[in-house]
């Protein structure tokens, strides 16, 4: 399938996954949907519709107890002309059955709207803390944290995290005090990279990258080279891939350029044989790049 913005393996399956289909751009995604992709015994793939959802941009599967929930974020709800943002997006959800064989074009999964009014509903990040899963969702009207229903309950819990226009965000404990900081790309496809620290129950900005990062889009937050780090890539101007860490000796954040002139869209971290790697989808240079990160 083309127009893939998200792919998530179905829990407990042998290679079956869900994927967005026909999301090409904010102006060309009225026919977007989430599809079920299943490997065939003799090779190839079976592709079926799970649910048609215009402008679906990011989605995920979150576990709560023994149940699994689909959470899906539509960038907007419609438009009348190019770059029309007059119809804000929404967050949709549904309990996901363990057997997806019944779903197809004629019998689609029923979704429920759990939050409306999400202008430029772009950013998504899965959070796992103490075995519990939740999601950070970023839009022009702020950053929100969504918790799936607890076992035996039906309603989602949604918290207001930060009231700033945001494109993407991740949570990372940079300074090691046990409280995760909030790293934010702002505004929508914007040029600001900031880090907020939680004090007295609310987030306060403690760092902002001194240079504009035009069309910031790729983001990873987590361990890198054995320490908490933020990786950000941006698609215009210098088109750099950046790494941010916190220096405990100086009490200051530091930045490092990992690569230049590539224009990353997405970035993924993994460790193999004790070495740290980043895979970057460098859209502006038509390449998939593999980086081994060293000190």
For every predicted segment, state its role.
Residues 1-295:
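Beta-propeller-forming repeat regions
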